[in-house]
Amino acid sequence: MEKRERHFVLVHGACHGAWCWYKVTTFLRSAGHKVTALDLAAAGANGKRLDELNSISDYHEPLMKFMTSLVAGEKVILVAHSLGGVSVSVAMERFPQKISVAVFVSAYMPGPDFNLSTVYQELHQRRQGASKDTQYTFDRGSNNPPTSIIFSPEDLAAKLYQLSPPEDLTLATTLMRPTKLFRGENLLKETTVTREKYGTVRRVYIVCDKDNILKEDFQRWMIKNNPSDEVKVIMGSDHMPMFSKPLDLCAYLQEIVESYS
């Protein structure tokens, strides 16, 4: 029986862009699927500047515009990596009828009873995330919280890409852009999700067991507090499975789409 084409929508994490999915995009297209890898605002090749982003809604606007553009009856598979999980969660809340399944790949996964502030606080308490080598910008002065972040070459090599091919690390150091940091009540309001909408979309979480920035115990803590329909594990993957274990990631994505589409 001929396989039906599915449409994967790939959403990158902080400081990255659509470029980070080049291996996954190539593999899925060669398998007969349609793939859209998006650049969020002021990321990748997107033309926006950081100072044009006033809220996290501005940041994930390209994904929301894309979801709005889908024709009636069309459903996509949303794949989120890292910080992309926040944008995908909001898309699930706004467009549940347009999503067949959402896949969180070592990604932030807030939920109806588990907001983004709780996720960030737990990450901070575990002393995970970016290190002292990370480069921050303080556009509102050094007495105020930082306004943007970009991973240092040291963080990339030790925490994100430690098991990835060196040429992909070089690619990242060439193409990365800073990510705006959003805070306050508006952040929580704009990322709130509900059981009635977000909760109706099926979710799969893919754990990366050798992730040095969102460690496995933190990933499983999110899953425990906001259970997904299924959990898969990529063994021997750093934070960037699209580089360190691209075939394993693509195999899982194809399994998921067969089960949930």
From Swiss-Prot:
<comment type="similarity">
    <text>Belongs to the AB hydrolase superfamily. Methylesterase family.</text>
</comment>
<feature type="active site" description="Charge relay system">
    <location>
        <position position="211"/>
    </location>
</feature>
<keyword id="KW-0378">Hydrolase</keyword>
<comment type="pathway">
    <text>Plant hormone biosynthesis.</text>
</comment>
<dbReference type="InterPro" id="IPR045889">
    <property type="entry name" value="MES/HNL"/>
</dbReference>
<dbReference type="GO" id="GO:0009409">
    <property type="term" value="P:response to cold"/>
</dbReference>
<dbReference type="GO" id="GO:0080030">
    <property type="term" value="F:methyl indole-3-acetate esterase activity"/>
</dbReference>
<dbReference type="GO" id="GO:0031408">
    <property type="term" value="P:oxylipin biosynthetic process"/>
</dbReference>
<feature type="domain" description="AB hydrolase-1">
    <location>
        <begin position="8"/>
        <end position="251"/>
    </location>
</feature>
<dbReference type="GO" id="GO:0080032">
    <property type="term" value="F:methyl jasmonate esterase activity"/>
</dbReference>
<comment type="subunit">
    <text>Homodimer.</text>
</comment>
<comment type="pathway">
    <text>Lipid metabolism; oxylipin biosynthesis.</text>
</comment>
<dbReference type="Pfam" id="PF12697">
    <property type="entry name" value="Abhydrolase_6"/>
</dbReference>
<dbReference type="GO" id="GO:0080031">
    <property type="term" value="F:methyl salicylate esterase activity"/>
</dbReference>
<feature type="active site" description="Charge relay system">
    <location>
        <position position="239"/>
    </location>
</feature>
<dbReference type="InterPro" id="IPR000073">
    <property type="entry name" value="AB_hydrolase_1"/>
</dbReference>
<comment type="function">
    <text>Methylesterase that catalyzes the hydrolysis of methyl jasmonate (MeJA) into jasmonate (JA). Can also use methyl salicylate (MeSA) as substrate with a lower efficiency.</text>
</comment>
<dbReference type="GO" id="GO:0009694">
    <property type="term" value="P:jasmonic acid metabolic process"/>
</dbReference>
<dbReference type="GO" id="GO:0010224">
    <property type="term" value="P:response to UV-B"/>
</dbReference>
<dbReference type="InterPro" id="IPR029058">
    <property type="entry name" value="AB_hydrolase_fold"/>
</dbReference>
<feature type="active site" description="Acyl-ester intermediate">
    <location>
        <position position="82"/>
    </location>
</feature>
<dbReference type="GO" id="GO:0009696">
    <property type="term" value="P:salicylic acid metabolic process"/>
</dbReference>
<protein>
    <recommendedName>
        <fullName>Methyl jasmonate esterase 1</fullName>
        <ecNumber>3.1.1.-</ecNumber>
    </recommendedName>
</protein>
